[in-house]
C-alpha cells in the first residue's frame, strides 16, 4: 500500500460503511459517550480511516468508536480518510502506527489473528511488516487463542476488562475451565475493580476446590464477607 502520497479526505454516508472488523474492537461505552459529547460541542475532529471497496462503499479500517459516537449524535455522515489498496495492507499499516494509535492488547491480538488466519500471512511475515519481533506476534496470537469465544465477547462488550481476562480468568481457565466460565459470567453482571480482582485471585489460589467454587460463584459476596471479617478483626485488636 502506497502511504507516501496525500490521501483524499471527504464526508461520506455512514450507510456506505462496511463494519467488517467490528469484531476486533472493544466497544468501550464510556469512551463512546465522551466522544459523542465532544462531537456535539466541537464536531468530528479526526477522520476515520476507510478502504475503498467499490464505487460507493468503504470498509471501515479504524474509527469504530467515532462511528458509534456519530450514530449516537444522530449523524448520517462521517469525515473519512480514504485509502486505496488491499485490506491486509491497511490492517498492517494501522498496527504499525504504534506512536499514533494506542491499541488494547486484545484488539491488537484480534487484528493479528485476522492477518494470520484470514489472509494467511506467516507470523514472521506479520512481524516484519509491523516492525515487531516474531515473539511479539506469537505471544498475542497465543493469548487470543487461550480465551473462549464467550469471554472474548464479554471483553468486546466492555463487560470484562482485558486485564481481568488475561491476568485472572485465563490462568483459572487453564486449570479449571468451568470456574473461569462461572467467574466471567458473574463479572459481566457485577464488575470488580482491578484491586478487588487481585485480592480475589490471591484468595482463589490459596483455596481448596470447594472454597474456589464459592469464590467464583459469588465473587462480590466473597469480598464483602472478607472485608467484614477484616473489620471485625481490627475492631477486636483495639
Task: Label each residue range with its predicted role.
Residues 8-10, 90, 105, 228-231:
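Exposed, low-complexity/repetitive linear segments and helix-based recognition motifs
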Residues 2-5, 14-23, 93-97, 149-154, ...:
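Short alpha-helical interface patches
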Residues 109-118, 139-238:
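Amphipathic alpha-helical extensions and coiled-coil-like segments
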Residues 8, 13, 102, 221-222:
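Short, solvent-exposed coil/turn linker segments
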Residues 1-83:
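Short, charged/polar connector segments at secondary-structure boundaries
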Residues 24-26, 33, 68-152, 157, ...:
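Amphipathic, charge-rich alpha-helical segments that serve as recognition/docking helices
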Residues 19, 28, 62-63, 96-100, ...:
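Generic structural "secondary-structure junction" signal
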Residues 1-7, 39-50, 101-123, 184-194:
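Short, charge-rich amphipathic segments
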Amino acid at each position: 500500500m502506497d502511504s507516501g502520497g496525500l490521501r483524499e479526505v471527504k464526508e461520506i454516508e455512514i450507510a456506505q460503511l462496511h463494519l467488517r472488523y467490528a469484531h476486533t474492537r472493544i466497544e468501550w461505552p464510556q469512551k463512546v459517550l465522551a466522544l459523542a459529547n465532544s462531537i456535539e460541542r466541537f464536531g468530528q475532529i479526526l477522520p476515520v480511516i476507510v478502504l475503498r471497496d467499490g464505487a460507493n462503499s468503504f470498509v471501515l479500517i479504524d474509527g469504530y468508536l467515532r462511528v458509534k459516537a456519530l450514530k449516537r449524535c444522530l449523524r448520517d455522515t462521517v469525515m473519512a480518510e480514504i485509502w486505496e489498496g488491499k485490506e491486509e495492507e491497511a490492517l498492517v499499516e494501522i498496527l504499525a502506527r504504534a506512536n499514533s494509535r494506542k491499541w488494547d492488547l486484545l484488539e491488537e491480538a484480534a487484528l493479528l489473528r485476522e492477518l494470520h488466519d484470514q489472509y494467511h500471512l506467516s507470523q514472521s511475515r506479520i512481524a516484519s511488516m509491523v516492525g515487531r519481533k516474531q515473539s511479539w506476534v506469537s505471544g498475542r496470537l497465543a493469548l487470543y487463542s487461550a480465551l473462549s469465544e464467550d469471554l472474548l465477547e464479554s471483553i468486546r462488550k466492555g463487560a470484562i476488562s482485558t486485564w481481568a481476562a488475561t491476568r485472572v480468568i485465563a490462568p483459572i481457565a487453564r486449570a479449571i475451565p468451568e470456574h473461569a466460565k462461572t467467574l466471567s459470567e458473574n463479572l459481566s453482571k457485577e464488575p470488580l475493580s482491578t484491586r478487588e480482582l487481585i485480592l480475589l485471585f490471591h484468595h482463589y489460589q490459596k483455596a481448596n476446590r470447594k472454597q474456589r467454587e464459592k469464590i467464583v460463584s459469588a465473587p462480590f459476596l466473597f469480598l464483602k464477607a472478607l472485608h467484614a471479617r477484616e473489620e471485625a478483626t481490627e475492631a477486636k485488636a483495639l
